Amino acid sequence: MAAKSFASRLRDSRRFLNGFLAGAVVGAAGAGLTALQFFRRPDAESAKLARQPHESAEEAVLEQFGFPLAGTETRRYTNHALSYDQAKRVPRWVLEHISKDKIIGDADRKHCKFKPDPSVPSAFSALNEDYIGSGWSRGHMAPAGNNKFSSEAMAETFYLSNIVPQNFDNNSGYWNRIEMYCRELTERFEDVWIVSGPLTLPHTRNDGTKTVSYQVIGEDNVAVPSHLYKVILARRSPESTEPLALGAFVVPNKAIGFQSQLSEFQVSLHDLEKMSGLVFFPRLDRSRDIRNICSVDTCKLLGFQEFTLYLSTRKIDGARSVARLEKVLEALKSSGVEPDDYFLSRYEKKLEELKAKEQKDAQLEKQS
């Protein structure tokens, strides 16, 4: 079925007027991140608190029918929270907390589907149809792989409120490697907080003028960011007196090779806040001794051989036939990477399973 146009969805949406309030309820009532909470009072409550004791008649008339609502209130989920940009149909920021326990478990992304966030009014939501055939991938800000502990938490990362149009190679390559590094940090830090989001940065023309322009995709004009950012805050343990480790990174939304180091994309938190218009970790005492995460830790991403081997090992599970499985091994060797013992053990186990299945299917076919 063809996707409805934006105008028709705006007219037909029964949730158009109620959606603003629905989003506010989600932001106020959801359960989840407890260590660092980013709450904003609903606009109506904020306006009420801001009034002077003796409100003038002019002020009362001014807000008689309410102020415009932007839908930027915090929306909370099982293991992430976000602020949504209703005009661009992408998140402004997405906050998550990960630990060693959260990145292991039985949750499997093959059971998850990309879909609109039910808390976002349909008039302001992106659709899968906006992405399909656009030349851009659906890029997670809070990745599914950070939520192996909970099927619900993982499924919620597939809401389109957590997704931005992302370069395919960037999504599966460099950005993926940054996400893997964040998970690796949980081996050395008990708590890791991550804020990720899109940026649309200005570029300078030949005549010296600065402009901001960006592509939009689909009927809903989903904004394609020029860059992506990630802020990482790591704590050794709740009892530790060691300084917190912090790093802010901005990467272009394009393919990035293996030669580029993560530290090359590091920026100061202050500069990122100026770029984004956001204040990150506002409850963090910046007067304390906060260390550069690239000085405390390695900031080293997986190299070509390690990363290729990792991806090939994952493809073993997805193989549905002996022929497909054999192609995984052929592709790995063609890339110049030799399989390690772990890969070979997984490969042999999967090969036995597929051969047994194919023999069973052949017998059933003969009997029928």
Swiss-Prot record:
GO terms for molecular function: 5'-3' exonuclease activity; endonuclease activity; metal ion binding; nucleic acid binding. Residues 1-41 form a transit peptide. Its main location: mitochondrion. A divalent metal cation binds at N171. GO terms for cellular component: mitochondrial inner membrane; mitochondrion; protein-containing complex. Its cofactor is a divalent metal cation. Transmembrane segments: none annotated. Keywords: Endonuclease, Hydrolase, Membrane, Metal-binding, Mitochondrion, Mitochondrion inner membrane, Nuclease, Transit peptide. The active site is at H140 (proton acceptor). It is an enzyme of class 3 (hydrolase). It is found in: Mitochondrion inner membrane. SUPFAM superfamilies: His-Me finger endonucleases. CDD domains: NUC. Signal peptide: none annotated. Endo/exonuclease with nicking activity towards supercoiled DNA, a preference for single-stranded DNA and 5'-3' exonuclease activity. PANTHER family: ENDONUCLEASE RELATED, NUCLEASE EXOG, MITOCHONDRIAL. Belongs to the DNA/RNA non-specific endonuclease family. Homodimer. This is Nuclease EXOG, mitochondrial. It comes from Mus musculus (Mouse). The lineage of its organism: Eukaryota, Metazoa, Chordata, Craniata, Vertebrata. The gene is Exog.
